[in-house]
Amino acid sequence: MGSPLLRKHAAMSDTPTVLFVCVHNAGRSQMAAGYLKALAGDRGEVLSAGSEPKDQINPVAIQAMAEEGIDIASGSPKILTTEAVRDSDVVITMGCGDACPFFPGKRYEDWELEDPAGQDIEAVRGIRDEIKGRIEVLLSEILSAKV
């Protein structure tokens, strides 16, 4: 029935690696990574990066995630590298798809999400909640692909 959703990671484990990419790696991708880490536990590896990373994570995104009991304050924005894409099974872009290197055999998705930069907490909560719903769907797909 076609190819599997995920290629098994060829490293030491068979847990899939998911890379979240947004322009600044300060809001959307950090929230998505935080949710997947919290919900997947050791069932997956999570990376995040940005094509033009900021110096720090958006404080309103940190606040919105803290309301969910998820601490993303200890992270820091990272530059997107070819290696990060190559080492991932699933690449989720959020507004920067063209900046992401393409490797055959990867699963790519582009999530159209509003940028939380400059937004108030109410707006960021809405973005956060949309990300959570998408993460729950992604996680169910990843877990069913491993069976």
What feature does the model see in each segment?
Residues 4-147:
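Short polar/charged helix/loop
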